[in-house]
């Protein structure tokens, strides 16, 4: 084998150092300069509350431990983030009045980002304000209330959240509530009750987005029937690829296209990979076998034995790897079924325990956009995915609200509308 003369080595190194930049990186940067990248769902406020407790009000947010948090200011900048819907989530297992109190604290915590770092964040309420914040070099911050239980059956509480800057309401979280069925709980209403329909109407009147992540398919279809404005799924993926009820079926995707809404793709591995979903269910079944109360668990009273048995099971049944490419598959599928005008990004960063390879934090959005470009997506279509689609939905909801401005505020109650005693 011939070797290169040593005299050529400096020239080759210099040539490599001045090689043309990655064409996809350049294209992504151009798109994100013109269009704000908007993520529909990030649980950073709740993650701060959970992991640093009372220090959440004062902990420096510029740089946080990436092993603990998916988000910080430096990584938001590196990821080219232009707009973020911060989730204000509280457990659906709490009494609803407690959920209201905790929601108010989460809202204030999200507002504190802009209060503490005004050069980095700007709190916004409209599509135009979001574009202006992006143009000024700030991350536009919006709020999403992640669960209908958080209004405690009160349209007045819903209006108060709107006055505090909430931009969407997720109709349920993990539990079915008095007026809407959840995707992950036993149905009670076959979708929305009359009060649930009144909530959708009030959301339209207020200019708040109707978020259908977490709800049952019956609730999805009822909301799509009732709403006057386009809906969002703030963090859901394609059920045809991963068959969990948290994802969106092709039937509903076609309805979303007709409605003008947008499905913002989730990164949670159990909603991305069917193999990972099945593995997770099997693992949960093993844990239940070890600990089934009161007397039937294989390792009742023997926590070390249960721990070893689970480790042995995991060794024999390794966790399936989930990747950035699989997330892109969901985006491709939704674009194919509903159209490229109806897909976005809703990562669920800081709300999940693990993430796909290649999507470890908010700095990784450009890698996902580059993957789609490799698959043949045009810059214009990537811009739609990144932010233009949800901006269109926001503007449409604002227009609907303007047309309903003469209507009185809703005053219905669960008892009055649903006949609940």
Predicted feature locations:
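N-terminal hydrophobic targeting/anchoring segments and the immediately downstream early-domain regions
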Residues: 19-190, 243-421
């Amino acid at each position: 084998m011939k070797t290169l003369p040593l005299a050529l080595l400096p020239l080759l190194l210099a040539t490599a150092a001045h090689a043309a930049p990655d064409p996809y990186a350049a294209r992504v940067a151009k798109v994100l300069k013109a269009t704000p990248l908007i993520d529909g769902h990030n649980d950073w406020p709740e993650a701060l509350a959970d992991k640093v407790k009372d220090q959440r009000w004062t902990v420096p947010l510029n740089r946080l431990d990436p092993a603990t948090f998916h988000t910080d200011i430096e990584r938001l900048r590196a990821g080219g983030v232009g707009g973020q819907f911060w989730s204000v989530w509280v457990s659906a297992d709490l009494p609803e009045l407690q959920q209201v109190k905790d929601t108010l604290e989460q809202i204030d915590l999200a507002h504190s980002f802009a209060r503490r770092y005004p050069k980095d964040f700007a709190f916004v309420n409209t599509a135009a304000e979001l574009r202006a914040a992006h143009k000024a070099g700030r991350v536009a911050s919006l709020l999403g209330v992640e669960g209908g239980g958080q209004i405690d059956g009160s349209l007045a509480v819903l209006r108060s959240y709107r006055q505090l800057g909430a931009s969407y309401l997720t109709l349920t979280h993990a539990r079915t509530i008095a007026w809407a069925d959840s995707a992950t709980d036993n149905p009670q209403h076959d979708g929305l009750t009359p009060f649930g329909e009144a909530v959708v109407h009030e959301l339209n009147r207020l200019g708040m987005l109707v978020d259908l992540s977490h709800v049952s398919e019956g609730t999805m279809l009822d909301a799509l029937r009732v709403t006057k404005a386009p809906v969002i799924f703030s963090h859901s993926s394609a059920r045809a690829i991963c068959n969990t009820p948290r994802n969106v079926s092709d039937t509903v995707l076609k309805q979303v296209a007709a409605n003008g809404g947008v499905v913002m793709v989730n990164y949670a591995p159990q909603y991305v990979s069917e193999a990972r979903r099945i593995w997770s269910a099997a693992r949960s079944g093993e844990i239940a076998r070890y600990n089934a109360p009161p007397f039937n668990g294989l390792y009742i009273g023997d926590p070390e034995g249960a721990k070893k048995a689970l480790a042995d099971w995991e060794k024999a049944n390794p966790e399936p790897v989930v990747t950035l490419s699989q997330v892109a598959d969901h985006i491709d599928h939704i674009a194919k079924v509903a159209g490229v005008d109806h897909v976005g990004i809703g990562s669920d960063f800081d709300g999940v325990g693990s993430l796909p390879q290649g999507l470890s934090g908010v700095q990784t959005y450009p890698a996902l956009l580059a993957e789609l470009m490799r698959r043949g997506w045009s810059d214009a279509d990537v811009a739609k995915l990144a932010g233009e689609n949800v901006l269109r939905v926001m503007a449409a909801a604002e227009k609907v609200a303007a047309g309903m401005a003469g209507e009185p505020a809703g005053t219905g109650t669960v008892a009055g509308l649903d006949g609940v005693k």
